C-alpha cells in the first residue's frame, strides 16, 4: 500500500529523523519452521497447548494482561492486521508485503525521502553498485539472520568484496551474527563502516528491561576497547585487512 509508505516517510520527515532504511529481503516470508510447529501468533491463540504454557508462566500472563494490547503502532490507523486478529508473522508478511517490489520502488522511496538512505538486505557487489545508482548513501549487508533464503551466504564474507568495489561511495553496515566486541572489530577490519544487531537488544530487553539493554551496550563497549588494546590499535582507522587472517580454502 503506497499510501502507508508515503505516510510513514512524511511522518519520519516531520519527526526530524536523520535517515531512512528500506528492508528488501522480506518480500515473502521465509520458512519459519519453529513458528509452524509452535503455532506462534500475535496475539496468541487460545489452544490447549498455549493454555498449558500460560499456566506454567504466570508472571508472563500477568505482564501480558496488565499492559496494552499488541498492535502495529506505525500502521494501526491503516490496517487492523496484527491487532485483535491472531496472525502469524508469516501470514502478516505474505498479506501486507509486495513480492513484486522492484528497484523502481526502492528508487521512489529514496527520492521521496531525499536524505541519507540505506537498503537492508544487500548481499552482492552488483546490488551494492545499483544502490549507489539510485541514490542510496548506505547499505546493510544482511541475510536477515539466515531466516529468509535457506543456504544464503554469510554477510561477513561479502563485506570485503563490496568495499573493494564501491570504495567510499557507500557506508557499509554489517548486519547479522554480531554477538561480541571481536565480531565488530573483524567486520570493521574487513571494510564495514559499522555493525548492527537486533536479537541482542530484544533478548536483553526481555530479560532485564532498560537495564538489560544498558548492560549489553556496556559489555560491547568494554569488549571493543579491551580487544583494540590487545591488538595494539589506537583508533578504529587502524583496523584494516592486515589485521585479519582467513582460512585457506581447500
Task: Show the residue positions of the predicted features.
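Alpha/beta catalytic cores of nucleotide-metabolism and tRNA/nucleoside-modifying enzymes
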Residues: 157-174, 178-250
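Conserved, mostly hydrophobic/aromatic
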Residues: 22, 109, 131, 139, ...
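Hydrophobic faces of well-ordered beta-strands that scaffold small-molecule active sites
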Residues: 20, 117-120, 140-141, 172-176, ...
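Residue-level recognition of oxygen-bearing side chains
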Residues: 127, 154, 183
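Extended hydrophobic/aromatic segments used for targeting, binding, or gating
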Residues: 132, 137-174
Amino acid at each position: 500500500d503506497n499510501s502507508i509508505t508515503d505516510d510513514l516517510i512524511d511522518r519520519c520527515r516531520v519527526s526530524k529523523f536523520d535517515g531512512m532504511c528500506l528492508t528488501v529481503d522480506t518480500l515473502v516470508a521465509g520458512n519459519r519452521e519453529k513458528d509452524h510447529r509452535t503455532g506462534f501468533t500475535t496475539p496468541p491463540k487460545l489452544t490447549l497447548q498455549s493454555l498449558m504454557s500460560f499456566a506454567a508462566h504466570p508472571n508472563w500472563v500477568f505482564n501480558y494482561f496488565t499492559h496494552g494490547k499488541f498492535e502495529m503502532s506505525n500502521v494501526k490507523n491503516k490496517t487492523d492486521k496484527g491487532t485483535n486478529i491472531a496472525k502469524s508473522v508469516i501470514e502478516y508478511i505474505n498479506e501486507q508485503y509486495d513480492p513484486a517490489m522492484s528497484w523502481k520502488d526502492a528508487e521512489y522511496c529514496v527520492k521521496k525521502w531525499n536524505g541519507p538512505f540505506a537498503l537492508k538486505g544487500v548481499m552482492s557487489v552488483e546490488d551494492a553498485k545499483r544502490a549507489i545508482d539510485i541514490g542510496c548513501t548506505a547499505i546493510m549487508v544482511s541475510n536477515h539472520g539466515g531466516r529468509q533464503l535457506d543456504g544464503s551466504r554469510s554477510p561477513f564474507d561479502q563485506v570485503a568484496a563490496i568495499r573493494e568495489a564501491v570504495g567510499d561511495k557507500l557506508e557499509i553496515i554489517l548486519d547479522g551474527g554480531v554477538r561480541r566486541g571481536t565480531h565488530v572489530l573483524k567486520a570493521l577490519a574487513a571494510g564495514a563502516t559499522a555493525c548492527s544487531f537486533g536479537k541482542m537488544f530484544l533478548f536483553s530487553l526481555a530479560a532485564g528491561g532498560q537495564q538489560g539493554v544498558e548492560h549489553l551496550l556496556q559489555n560491547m563497549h568494554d569488549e571493543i576497547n579491551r580487544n583494540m588494546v590487545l591488538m595494539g590499535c589506537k583508533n578504529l582507522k587502524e583496523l584494516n585487512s592486515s589485521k585479519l587472517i582467513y582460512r585457506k580454502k581447500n
